[in-house]
């Protein structure tokens, strides 16, 4: 049995979908549905049990993992990069992950967890996933800091030889519909095109950067989860790995791809970036994928335009269809 935390969320539900594609259905999902629309992400998936995240943690602390658990894929977290409640992030992202990691190590169970490219901060220290460089990283948000704390703790406890952490870069795609302001630019652009035939993008406020040329390592969720599930293979060594394409693309590239997939000519309004975002805004990210490639992990390779076309034409134009 495989446990997937955050299994009703964006990446977590896509992990369950990928497991289903490989014939795996004995899956326990851990999440908090509340009054959100996340339950739609589960409707087409096959799994054997659902646990509320708080009850699961109480059971974990009282008696450890379920005896038949063979692996834990821990995608559950507060993923809002603008969350300001540091205590909430410390509990939900740091302490919850620590408790789960300890239980997995004690039981000899494979542990795969989500770190983030937000740990790289402004990128001045590069984007190498060499664990020896962790101490040099300076995240720009409390979200990134919470992920950094987990990476440092995993290394300090000596768990990284038996666990795999993925530093996700900019993931977009199917099943992200519930994410509010954390929706990808691809989805936001589609919504604007669908409703107003135009898209708003932040104008550059930094000298030397043209409007729209801020780059990200955009990663299609279908590619991302193939690599995550591959890490269940014990032949993949433990450690922290970047998860991106290794190919930076601009926001303008992405928006143009959405217009093209929707069969429209680009029509863009440039708007000023809010003051509160300017100090923590990244102008360039790109995953160094050498380490992942050396251990045989699949490097996501779907071209941006092809991924956007699949997302827009296969799902968004079909009424926000879900995976499964």
Give the residues covered by each predicted segment.
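Mid/C-terminal beta-alpha module of Rossmann-like enzyme folds, strongest
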Residues: 186-189, 195, 227-277, 322
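Conserved C-terminal active-site "lid" loop/helix of NAD(P)H-dependent oxidoreductases
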Residues: 221, 275-299
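Catalytic helix-loop patch of NAD(P)-dependent Rossmann-fold dehydrogenases
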Residues: 91, 95-99, 106, 110, ...
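Amphipathic terminal alpha-helices
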Residues: 21, 303-324
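N-terminal Rossmann NAD(P)H-binding glycine-rich loop of SDR-like oxidoreductase domains
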Residues: 2-22
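Non-catalytic, hydrophobic alpha-helical segments
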Residues: 224, 228, 243, 254, ...
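NAD(P)H-binding glycine-rich loop region in Rossmannoid oxidoreductase-like domains
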Residues: 44, 53-54, 58-92
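Glycine/proline-rich active-site loop of Rossmann-fold NAD(P)-dependent oxidoreductases
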Residues: 171-187, 206, 210-214, 221-222, ...
């Amino acid at each position: 049995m495989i446990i997937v935390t955050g299994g009703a969320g964006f990446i977590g539900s896509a992990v369950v979908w990928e497991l289903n594609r490989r014939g795996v259905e004995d899956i326990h999902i851990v999440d908090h549905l509340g009054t959100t629309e996340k339950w739609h992400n589960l409707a087409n998936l096959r799994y054997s049990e659902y646990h509320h995240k708080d009850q699961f943690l109480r059971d974990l602390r009282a008696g450890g993992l379920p005896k038949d658990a063979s692996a834990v894929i821990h995608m559950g977290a507060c993923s809002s990069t603008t969350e300001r409640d540091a205590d909430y992030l410390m509990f939900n992202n740091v302490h919850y992950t620590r408790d789960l990691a300890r239980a997995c190590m004690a039981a000899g169970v494979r542990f795969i967890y989500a770190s983030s490219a937000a740990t790289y901060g402004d990128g001045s220290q590069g984007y190498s996933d060499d664990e020896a460089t962790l101490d040099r990283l300076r995240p720009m948000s409390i979200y990134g800091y919470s992920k950094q704390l987990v990476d440092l703790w995993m290394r300090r406890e000596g768990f990284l030889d038996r666990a795999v952490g993925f530093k996700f870069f900019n993931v977009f795609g199917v099943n992200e519909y519930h994410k509010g302001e954390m929706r990808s630019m691809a989805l936001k652009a589609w919504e604007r095109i669908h409703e107003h035939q135009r898209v708003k993008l932040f104008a550059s406020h930094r000298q030397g950067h043209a409007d729209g040329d801020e780059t990200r390592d955009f990663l299609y969720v279908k590619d991302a989860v193939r690599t995550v599930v591959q890490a269940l293979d014990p032949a993949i060594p433990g450690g922290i790995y970047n998860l991106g394409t290794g190919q930076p693309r601009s926001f303008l590239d992405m928006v143009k791809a959405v217009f093209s997939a929707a069969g429209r000519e680009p029509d863009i309004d440039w708007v000023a970036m809010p003051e509160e975002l300017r100090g923590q805004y990244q102008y360039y990210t790109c995953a160094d994928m050498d380490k992942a490639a050396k251990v045989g992990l699949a490097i996501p390779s779907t071209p941006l335009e092809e991924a956007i076309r699949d997302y827009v034409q296969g799902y968004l134009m079909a009424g926000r269809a879900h995976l499964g």
